[in-house]
From Swiss-Prot:
Originating organism: Bos taurus (Bovine)
Coiled-coil annotated residue ranges, if any: none
Positions bearing carbohydrate: 100
Protein name: Divergent protein kinase domain 2B
PANTHER family: DIVERGENT PROTEIN KINASE DOMAIN 2B, GH11358P
Gene name linked to the record: DIPK2B
Source lineage: Eukaryota, Metazoa, Chordata, Craniata, Vertebrata
One Pfam family here: PIP49_C
Signal peptide: 1-29
Family recorded in the similarity comment: Belongs to the DIPK family.
GO cellular component: extracellular region
Primary residence: secreted
Amino acid sequence: MEPRLGPKAAALHLGWPFLLLWVSGLSYSVSSPASPSPSPVSRVRTSYNLGKTFLGLDKCNACIGTSICKKFFKEEIRFDNGLALHLGPPPDDLPSYSANYSDDFKTWRPVEISRLVSKQQNKISDGRICASAAAPKTCSIERVLRKTGRFQKWLQAKRLTPDLVRGLSSPLLRCPSQRLLDRVVRRYAEVADAGSIFMDHFTDRDKLRLLYTLAVNTHPVLLQIFPGAEGWPLPQYLGSCGRFLVSTSTSPLQEFYGAPPDQAADLAYQLLGVLESLRSNDLNYFFYFTHVDADMFGIFNNGHLFIRDASALGVIDRQEGSQAASGAGDNKDIFSCLVSGCQTKLPSCDTIPEKQNLVLVCSQVLPLLLQAKFPSPVQEEIDAELTRCADGTRPDPEVLGAASRLKDILRPLRTCDPRFAYRYPDCKYDDKF
């Protein structure tokens, strides 16, 4: 299948060099005789340099990584036609971009190109780094970060231990176990020869990239260590380039608020199932959200619901136990302050109840998906269980019970047809439908 290009874009065959030109604010007209075009070599060189700035490659190694950069420059990742139709620059402050991805130029699939944080937040973070060293606003942020006491400890470390991440603001690292941190190192996809719990194969550059990512946004790390291919409800991590990551594409749950009743019931049923898997799974990790909104959940084109944004997801190790972030305030440094105030106080992991995910989703997401969708008796039952599920003052068992009853109500409201390709045609042979 060819990528989704409009007629004008198809005629121009806008690949990565052209995309970089207008992404960086240049305009180039193939039909204007008024001014001669630059030579192809000059144009590609300029495109490459400007593209480095757009992607954040000029900020490396204060970035995510470079594992997928070749795909961009070989034109195996192309922006969606919504941008390709314009030769002027697209908005460069969007949180994400739709694109098409190919391994052979013959078959293409939709992907999402996402920033770790907003462009404005990047500017603030970079400014804080320079200010921490009393340096000019345009300092070498990599040089400043390399001189920090935390990174010097990372350079000497053979293994990623809890003391090396203590004080970072991410919920993933609020009370990490050694088992969890070993999993981070073993599955970190931005280095060659992944698989060991020791960091002997990490270069200085690799360590800085991992530390920066953990400090700014752990979403790409979670996609790597809990991959969808193993049954985790997360999209596939395809790689990163500069300060962007590439993952499989999903549509935000918010776009389905107007869905027909059977589809709304199916999505709500799936979402409750996802929350159940976060609470109870074979690896004995308890995943919890610090906050939720509809954009954090997404739907693949086969109807399957996943967690689209894992940046607000924390992990507590029930098997090994987590090392509490005691003394975290004594470990705060510039890495602790890149995306939040240095004075931000994080709640203890011991205070996270099992009901937390359900209370958040039942109060802030499901009502908008399920409101006024069903006949009166059924709708009243749904609303009643949603109210119980959203009540944070109730004990854990009562909230969990309300969620279970809500699933029981939703189950027979789902239908079996090709719109739900993730479970069709198997559902035809299931007596629950």
